């Protein structure tokens, strides 16, 4: 059973977050291992496995990028384990430039200001590509959506690096 079916949701990118959370809580109560504490070992193990599946499904569907990756996995794209590299040379150059810019910001005397500007640009790039991905998934353009998700994964990793740098800069001020 796929995660969308498990939660009673249509298999689409745009989902009702409150419905997801409500169904998650219902399933958690229904399959909580404590409810099976006095049952035979086989039933206890089955409830543990079901609870783990429910948790994995919820974490996947809750997170927009993971949800997109999961939708693509249902179409045969295993983005989590692939060695596929992007052939978009313009994007590859953009990646290099963004990483170099972030490295330069870290060494800059006004790093906080530059990092705020960089972070805003990164947020706009992520928003633009996310909108494109939503359109592609909606039109079932799986190959194009997979490429866009690969690019969003890079931007997501870069955002994590920005947050780490912010923490280091904040710690240096303390």
From Swiss-Prot:
Belongs to the HscB family. This is Co-chaperone protein HscB. The gene is hscB. GO terms for biological process: [2Fe-2S] cluster assembly; protein complex oligomerization; protein folding. Interacts with HscA and stimulates its ATPase activity. Interacts with IscU. Keywords: Chaperone. The keyword Acetylation does not apply. Gene3D superfamilies: DnaJ domain, HscB, C-terminal domain. The lineage of its organism: Bacteria, Pseudomonadati, Pseudomonadota, Gammaproteobacteria, Enterobacterales.
